[in-house]
A protein has these predicted regions:
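Cyclophilin-like peptidyl-prolyl cis-trans isomerases
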Residues: 2, 20-226
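Bacterial N-terminal signal peptides
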Residues: 5-17
Length: 226
């Protein structure tokens, strides 16, 4: 089964030029076994949408610039009333959904520095939340969530051109069923320009609120039976 993802490197910004980068075809990869380590600091955010709630753990320690930017939008209630407006379904269970402020002058904050995955150690596995951008350093208030492993969106310094990838900054921990419903939602056959034509949700899916929520305490460790 071939999972062709080349167009995805071109579709991640709203009303901005497409990226020059062409992503390679991703292949599912099993995570390497790692020794037990303290879990990095995270902040949990709930996106309440009209199709259900998506909870995300935002990596404030590993991706401080990008996570801090997202939390400024959350804490300022700038995402309340915005929408998931785009869904790209490459094949069943594989694609992405995009949301954000869409350059709304009343909501948008200044662009942030690009924080590549080579710096954060994060990767675009399924359920990753990451920033939409054109050139590096142009990300602001639009983001996407992956469905399926898309490690071609990570930084690849050994490749030519714009090889810095996208800035992942968290992971969906609850509500991937909602993400899937948004991915499958109806799209307009005529809206959108260029590669985005046919990818615009119609109707859009509203983000009613975006709020910090308490992170559940870790589950108690059960000692092995003697």
């Amino acid at each position: 089964m071939i999972r062709h993802i080349a167009p995805l490197a071109l579709l991640l910004l709203c009303a901005t030029p497409a990226l020059a980068q062409v992503a390679a075809t991703p292949t599912p990869t099993a995570p390497a076994a790692m020794p037990d380590q303290p879990k990095p600091t995270v902040v949990r955010v709930a996106l309440q949408t009209t199709l259900g709630t998506i909870e995300i753990e935002v990596e404030t320690e590993r991706a401080p610039i990008t996570a801090g930017n997202f939390l400024r939008y959350v804490d300022g209630k700038r995402l309340d009333g915005t929408t998931f407006y785009r869904a790209v379904k490459v094949q069943e269970g594989f694609g992405l959904i995009q949301a954000g402020v869409r350059n709304d002058a009343k909501r948008v904050l200044p662009n942030i520095a690009h924080e590549p995955t080579t710096k954060t150690g994060l990767s675009h596995t399924t359920g990753t939340i990451s920033m939409a951008r054109a050139a590096p350093g142009t990300a602001s208030g639009d983001f996407f969530i992956t469905v399926g492993d898309m490690t071609s969106m990570d930084a690849h310094p050994d490749q030519p051109g714009d090889n810095l990838g996208f800035a992942a900054f968290g992971k969906v921990v609850s509500g991937m069923d909602v993400v899937g419903r948004i991915l499958d939602a109806p799209k307009s056959p005529t809206e959108g320009e260029g590669v985005m034509k046919g990818q615009m949700l119609a109707p859009t899916i509203a983000i009613v609120t975006a709020r910090r929520v308490k992170t559940p305490p870790p589950a108690p460790v059960t000692p092995p039976a003697l």
